[in-house]
Structures are given as structure tokens and as C-alpha cells.
Amino acid sequence: MESEKPKKTQEMKTDLKLLLECLKYHMGNPLSQKEVLITIHSVCKQNSDAGIYFREIGGLMFIINLAKSSEQSLVKEAALYTLGSIAEENVYCQQSLCTSELFQDLTGLLTNDDSNTNLKRMSVYVLLVLVSNNRNGQTLVREVGCIEVLSQMFRTVLSNYELNLSDNSVFQSYLLWSSVCSTLCVCVNNPQNDENQMLCCSLFPCVNEWLMNCMRPEVIRPICSFIGLTLANNTHAQNCFVSSGGLDVLCQVLVQLESDSHNTLSSAKLAVIVTKTMDACITDNSAAFTVVLSKYHIVSTLLALLLHESLDSREKFSIILAIGHCTEDCEKNQYELLKNNGLPLMIQALTEFKNEDLSKAATYVLHNCKKITGKLSLSLGQNSFGENEIELKDISEKETLREHWKAAKEILCRIKQFEKGGKEEKQQNRSGHYKDNTPSMKVNIQTNLKRLCADSTGGTRAEDKDINQSRELRSYKPSEIMSKACANENQLTTRKKNTNPVHPFCKEKGQSKIVHETTPSCAQNLDKEKTFDQKDSVSQSSDQVLKHLPHTVKNRKQVPETDPFTLCLDIIDREVGIQATDSCSRMLKYTCSGCIVARKLLNSRNFSKFLHSCAYQCVHHKVIMEAEDKYKNELRKTFICAKKILLTPCRRRQLCKESTASEELKIVHQKPDSKKLPGLEAQALNTSIPEAMERRSPVPGQSGLHKKRRIRKDFTKEEVNYLFHGVKTMGNHWNSILWSFPFQKGRRAVDLAHKYHRLIKGPSCAAL
């Protein structure tokens, strides 16, 4: 074998010498010269050392002179093709041919109108070989002015956007245009040349025209290669491309190709090429250019393209990397990724594919979305992006208005019931049958009616700009009556506490400490007061009391702290939202501590304890506390009774005596002629606050807690549209659909699943 190699080398040298002599001998025969040149090309291609030897014997210089001097186009084409193939196989031949004289000769052939298309194509081929991977060649092609000639050919070779490649002349022109495009690519990159990149930026308007008018793969592939190499690692070139509208054109082409990819496989492959080009445009300026991408919803387009089954791992890597650059420092694109179920796709790429590059790209995308995911988890339900913000705002306004109307109707019903109760009390006072030695309760009734008036009118809605400015209230001085009412209330509270069998173990620890569990609420004061003094009380209807209301309110600083009604007026007026009439006086907008404190600081453990420590509660929190206290009392009764149940006969008799004694004690303290206002206790609990309704204590005689059936809410047209759109984009991920769209409050994932299956079965089932 070793002896054969020198023998073959010697034979190759002999062949090249003979071929060079034949080339010189057939100077007058163009066809023979063409055949000799093709044979030289074949010998040099089989052996890389043949080009070096052919250069040493002067063969390269002879072929260069032949290409210059020959008048036959056929010989020139063969000579240029042979030079290009020898330079392509051997780098030493490439360096020896890389001279300014040869570049000038090639430029002359390209600018000569007598040169045919095939000769120009061979000249471009030689330029391509000399410039490729050769910084010296890139410099010469710029200094000689050859790059300007190539740019002009790029603009003018193909004049018609509608390519008819079946026509031979059009096909030859297309091959020349494609060679020019490839030569420009090696002029700007491999290695990267910033100066040549800036010169090629002048072609961006022409490139945009081609992309907009011709969507054929034969045009898009070379143009995308040229754009990608021209923009690579050059911020200034990227800015020029975006300012010329190139990024918008690429986005439009990508969207069109993705929509066509469902029908043709080639469109999906072509969309990946456009994706790489777009990624090269935004790599170094992702923060500045990703806003343009969000306008065309490129992230959702890339996610849809990623699901195409025909793509391999390298193509999917290019798509995921482009998604990473789109979502970097752009919250709109990050939100679009979350909305279109992009995170599960990234996690799937991490787990299912074993490609290391693909895993790194998916990790890059997840890292970009880490910040916005944390924001959404902290403020779930607050959507501040695009169209969803307007829709959610309209829905919240409608719900708030509906709640205000509901609260106003409830308060109107309560006013009517109190007026009816006031008329009955007036009749009872006139008959003179209800008398008692307890002090007058006139002030308490007026205070209750005063609160109801504030409920009906919604209080005053005007807010003072200066918070420290106190509002003047028209009043008279009922200090003595109010102190008596407070003492009365404390006596009733003590009496009830002594007769309550549930609290035998609760003892007063001091006069300064208030036991909030036994404090009566605003709505229960009238239930606990049994009789009215006929001498002290004046028979008035609710209308008369309301007329004198402006004169019965004292300055807020002078009202005793024991009055629980005036403290909640402003909270009720904020809930109802009705402006006060001129007869109602302006009051300060006080709220209880439960309303002021941040909700993040409260939880199910410290909420009850915190409200019990408040000196005042609003109607909202009073109802909550009453329902909770009533529920706890029932539990304590059950616990005490269960603890006292024994099988010993003597203890059983003792238990019966205690229960009998407690019942008698209740009868003694309850007046036989006392009469509660109708429906007052029910109205105290029946408020517009959903929390109080949900925590209402069970009916006596029923054991345990019973779940309430949910109120039926029919699906609106918007919800049905949300449901179908969510299934189309996310599949049967009901929980994701539930949190992605603004469904009504109380909707669950299982409700969406059942509704969707009913809608699929038919309209008759969907009505259910």
C-alpha cells in the first residue's frame, strides 16, 4: 500500500502535465479546451495535493489568463468553474487566487452587458469560493466595489415577483439570483464582518418587498439566510432592519405559514426557518423589539407551531429558543405564554425529550416566566392585560351595582317592618296594658330608627378633602338619657348572662373588661328589652321620629362610646351607595378595626379574637360575631349536656333537677306580657353580607351542621364562549380554564365539565 501511494502521486503529476500541454495545444478549439478543463477539475477533486502541484507548474495562472483572453463564452465558463473548484478543494490555492486583479476581472464580467447569465453565474461562484471563510477575501470584495455590484444584481436580476420556474430563462435568472444571495451571505458572515453587514443593510427594503409579495420556499429560504447572517451579533443592523419594517413583515409571514402548516408539511418547515431569522433579529435587543412581537401574538403562534408532529428535536429547539427571547423582559409575552398553556409544554420538553439543548432552552423560558408567575399567584383574579382587563372591570361593576340594589331593597323592607312594629307599640302604649318599673327605652328606639334612616338614605356620600376637619352635627343634649340607656343595656346583659346555662363558668374578671361574647348587637337590643314605660315614652310614629332626627344627633366627639349605632352609619352608606337627603346630617366616616386592618394579617385563627378585642364593630362584623357566638353557645350546650349524661341513677336525678331549675330561672326573668317586635331577630341575621348567611347557626332541634345547597346560576352566553374557547386552546384542563376566564363566582371545574358535555350532546341537554 505504501509503495502504491507514491506511484499514484507520480501518475497524477504526469496526468496534470499532459493535460496542461493539451490545453495549450488546443487553443483554437473551444470544445476540446472545455473537455480538458473538466478533466483537470476531476483530477484535482480526487486528490487534494493535485491543486498544489498544478499551481506549482503554473496551471492556475494559465487558466486565469485563458479566462481573460478567450473570446469564447464557453471557454470562459469552463475556466472559471475549474478555478473555483480547485480553490474550494485547497486553501493554499484559495489564498494564491485571492488578489485584487482577479476581483476586478470578476467585477468586470458581472457588469458587462455582453456576459450571459451562465457566465455571470460562474463569476459569482468564484467570488463565493474566494470570500468564504476568508477575511482577506471579504476585505477585497468591499474595497474593489464588488459588493455594491452584487447588491445591485440582487435588486435587478429577478424583476417579477411571480416566478415561473418552468420557463428556462426565468429558471436561469433565479439560479443567478440565488448565487448572488449566497455570495452576499458569505460576505457578511463566516467570519462576521461588521462593515460588510452595514453595507448590506441597504438591501432591507428590497428584502421586505420580496417577503410580502412572494411566499414561495425558493425565495424565502435564501432571503431568510441573508437576513439572519446580516443581523447576527450586530445591534445597529438589527435596528436598521426593524426601522425599515422588516420585523413586522417577518411576523406576518410567520403567522401565515403557521396557519398553512396544518395543510402542508413544507409550510411548517418554512415557518421554522422564518422563526430562526426572527430570533436573530431580537437576540441582542429583546427588550426593545418584543413589543412588536406581542402585537402579532407571536408567542401563541410559536406554541402552536411547536405542537406540529413533523418537526424534529433541532427544529423544536429553535422554536423554544425563540420563545425564550420573546418572553425575556416582556410581561405581555410572558402572560400570553401562560394564557396559551405554554408552561406545561415547557415542562413536557424538560421531561420527555432527552436532548440537552432542548432542556436548556425550556429551562430558559421557565426562568423568564418565574417573576410574572409569582405576581399572578399573589394577585389572583386581578387581570391587568389587554382585553381581559376591560371585560373583568365591566363584570365587577355590574356585580357591585347588583349588590347595592339588593342591599337597598333589604333595608327598605327593614324600615317597613320597624314602622309596622312602631305602630303596634303605639297601640299597646295607648291601651295601657304594658307597664313596667324599668327605665324608659325611648332613646334606644330613636337610636334604632336613626340607624335605619341612615341605612335607607345611604348616609352622606360627600367626602371632605381634609381628613382632620370635623363635621358639625345638629343635635341636642341627651347625655342623661343616653347614660340611662347604657346602664339599662348593661343590666339586661348581666341578667341574660346569669340566666344562661351555657356560661356558668364565665366569671367577670373586672369592671374594666368587657365580655364581648354576651354584648348585645345593634339589631338585638329591641329583642332583649321587654317593656316600655308609658309615662316616659311618647307615642310617636316612625315618620315623626325621622322628622326630628336632625335634632337628636350630637357632635361625634360628645356622643358616648357606648352608642353602637352611629359608628356603623358610614359603612352602610358605602355598601348601599345612595346619596343622603338634605334632612340627614353629615357624619364622619368611621370604620371598625376589622375593616381597617389589612386582610393579609388576618386568618381563621386570629380573626374572631381580633374582633372581640374591638370596642366597636360595624354591621358587617357584628352579624359575623353574633352568628359565631350563637354557634359556639350551641356547641357549649351540647358539650355540657354530653358531659353530664351518666348511667348512675342519683346523678341522673340531679341532672334533671338542674335542667328544671334553669328552665324556671328563664321563666322568672322573662316577663309574661313582654312581646318582641316581629321578625326583628330574623332581620338582624338576614343581612346582605354573604359571610353572615353562610355562618348562620343551625335551627334548634337539628343536630350537626348541614350543608346548604348552592344557588343555581345559569351559564351566560359569555361563559359558554369562554368554555368553548378554553377547551379549544387548553383541552380538557377544566381547572386551568376556570382560572383563565372570568366565570361567575361559585363556579367549579366540575361545573364546567358537566356543562361542556351537555352542550356537546345537544341543545336540549344544554338547557339543563
From Swiss-Prot:
Residues the record lists as Phosphothreonine modifications: 648
Main location: nucleus
Processing after translation: Phosphorylated by CDK. Phosphorylation by CDK takes place in late prophase when the cap exchange is prominent. is important for the stabilization of telomere attachment but dispenable for the cap exchange.
Keywords assigned by UniProt, alphabetized: Chromosome, Coiled coil, Meiosis, Membrane, Nucleus, Phosphoprotein, Repeat, Telomere
CDD domains membership: SANT_DMAP1_like
Family as reported in the entry's similarity comment: Belongs to the TERB1 family.
Annotated protein name in UniProt: Telomere repeats-binding bouquet formation protein 1
Organism, scientific name: Mus musculus
